[in-house]
């Protein structure tokens, strides 16, 4: 949630940011009207209170002089003013709630370093690592390789749960587990993250604090009548665990990692990536989250992104890092790097991680603060990134490490986890 003072003091900056994000600017005008009405109600209430205080003094003087008629008249007037003050107070409170609800729909303000653009076509490639493999045989897509090995089953998954689900078997099921353990070991042992095991069901307030609600409620799986939500990413509980808390300066930065399944309805992705495991309703992910001092958050973004990149480097998978433009930024992000892995089946790079600096956007929604060196309360900055999406990493290994006979070579770093050098 953005700071209402920024909206009030520099509305044209917000308007320009919304325009660059390709967001309807009318929501800003509605918010400014609500803010104006709220401040007018508060100002009028304050004047009425001052008038009531003046009348109270006059009542005391009238009683002292024995003028009971005047005192009674003034008391009636004071009573009427008290009713007006109460009504104005209730009006201001209602307008304040409307303003907060409106603010919940306004996205974060892009950082000045974010390239301006309308869509993914305007994203900027920052760097590349590795070279796509040149096959000397007819390579197969993972949706053919996996079923051919009897280790990837889309048909029975559809029978169980419908489209966009998969069953992994035998060595591919073990490969998924190996990837999870490898990623967690790397991040905890070498990158300094604290591992956390989290609930997969969270309350509405938790989803709202992290920017998932109210805007993206149709994307979430919801349980009735409990009004609980299956997490779309471990970012949600990792960030919201500190909701309504005050952290100490010496506790920053805090770096967390967690493995969880993630659940997404993908309501707006009809017709996209319909084959295989690229876009499914349930997928595994290792998440990275930082809580940092505001002065250090952009340096932290570079470090977090490097931590995610290291997974791909160790696995020997070609990738590139892309800076998202303003029109392609996620709702809560001020700046995002997408890490895209090379997939031969698409003959293209596909997203495997998004690493974002959210600045104080989530901290304001979730009231997450820290005490600075002067003992003043300030909002922390939060960052998040996938380190990595496990299913897409598995797909990248299957496709990039395939052999001419249809088997799959295991990346060297995973051999100790797998106990074999070849799958199939």
Curated annotation (Swiss-Prot):
Homodimer. The tRNA molecule binds across the dimer. The keyword Cytoplasm applies. Pfam families: Seryl_tRNA_N, tRNA-synt_2b. Pathway: Aminoacyl-tRNA biosynthesis; selenocysteinyl-tRNA(Sec) biosynthesis; L-seryl-tRNA(Sec) from L-serine and tRNA(Sec): step 1/1. Catalyzes the attachment of serine to tRNA(Ser). Is also able to aminoacylate tRNA(Sec) with serine, to form the misacylated tRNA L-seryl-tRNA(Sec), which will be further converted into selenocysteinyl-tRNA(Sec). NCBIfam families: serS (TIGR00414). L-serine binds at residues 233-235, 287, 386. It is an enzyme of class 6 (ligase). GO terms for molecular function: ATP binding; serine-tRNA ligase activity. One of its GO terms (biological process) is selenocysteine biosynthetic process. The lineage of its organism: Bacteria, Thermotogati, Thermotogota, Thermotogae, Kosmotogales. Belongs to the class-II aminoacyl-tRNA synthetase family. Type-1 seryl-tRNA synthetase subfamily. It catalyses: tRNA(Ser) + L-serine + ATP = L-seryl-tRNA(Ser) + AMP + diphosphate + H(+); tRNA(Sec) + L-serine + ATP = L-seryl-tRNA(Sec) + AMP + diphosphate + H(+). It comes from Kosmotoga olearia (strain ATCC BAA-1733 / DSM 21960 / TBF 19.5.1). Keywords: Aminoacyl-tRNA synthetase, ATP-binding, Cytoplasm, Ligase, Nucleotide-binding, Protein biosynthesis. It is found in: Cytoplasm. ATP binds at residues 264-266, 280, 351-354. This is Serine--tRNA ligase. Its main location: cytoplasm. Consists of two distinct domains, a catalytic core and a N-terminal extension that is involved in tRNA binding. One of its GO terms (cellular component) is cytoplasm. Transmembrane segments: none annotated. It comes from the Bacteria. Its EC number is 6.1.1.11.
């Amino acid at each position: 949630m953005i700071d209402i003072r920024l909206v009030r003091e520099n509305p044209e900056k917000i308007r320009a940011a919304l325009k660059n994000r390709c967001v309807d600017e009318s929501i800003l005008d509605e918010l400014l009207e609500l803010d104006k009405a709220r401040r007018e109600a508060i100002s009028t209430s304050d004047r009425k209170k001052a008038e009531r205080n003046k009348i109270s003094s006059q009542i005391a003087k009238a009683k002292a002089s024995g003028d009971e008629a005047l005192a009674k008249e003034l008391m009636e007037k004071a009573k009427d003013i008290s009713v007006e003050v109460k009504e104005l107070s209730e009006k201001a409170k209602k307008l304040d709630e409307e303003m907060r609800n409106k603010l919940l729909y306004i996205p974060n303000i892009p950082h000045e370093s974010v390239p301006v653009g309308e869509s993914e076509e305007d994203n900027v490639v920052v760097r590349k690592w590795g070279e796509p493999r040149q096959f000397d045989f007819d390579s197969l897509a993972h949706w053919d390789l996996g079923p051919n090995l009897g280790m990837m089953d889309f048909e029975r998954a559809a029978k169980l749960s419908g489209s966009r689900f998969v069953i992994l078997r035998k060595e591919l099921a073990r490969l998924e587990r190996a990837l999870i353990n490898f990623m967690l070991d790397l991040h905890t042992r070498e990158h300094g993250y604290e591992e956390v095991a989290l609930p997969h069901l969270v309350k509405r307030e938790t989803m709202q604090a992290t920017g998932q609600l109210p805007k993206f409620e149709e994307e979430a799986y919801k349980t009735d009548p409990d009004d609980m939500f299956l997490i779309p990413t471990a970012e949600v509980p990792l960030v919201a665990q500190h909701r309504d808390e005050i952290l100490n300066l010496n506790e920053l930065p805090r770096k967390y990692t967690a493995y969880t399944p993630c659940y997404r309805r993908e309501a707006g992705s009809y017709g996209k990536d319909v084959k295989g495991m690229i876009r499914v309703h349930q997928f595994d992910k290792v998440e990275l989250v930082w809580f940092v001092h505001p002065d250090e958050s952009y340096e932290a973004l570079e470090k977090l992104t490097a931590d995610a990149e290291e997974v791909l480097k160790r696995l020997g998978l070609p990738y590139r890092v892309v800076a998202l433009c303003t029109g392609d930024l996620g709702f809560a992000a001020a700046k995002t790097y997408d890490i895209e892995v090379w997939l031969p089946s698409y003959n293209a790079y596909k997203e495997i991680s998004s690493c974002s600096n959210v600045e104080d956007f989530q901290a304001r929604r979730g009231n997450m603060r820290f005490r600075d060196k002067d003992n003043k309360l300030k909002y922390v900055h939060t960052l998040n990134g996938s380190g990595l999406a496990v299913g897409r990493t598995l797909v990248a290994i299957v496709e990039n490490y395939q052999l001419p006979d249809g088997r799959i070579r295991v990346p060297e770093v995973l051999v100790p986890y797998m106990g074999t050098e070849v799958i199939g």
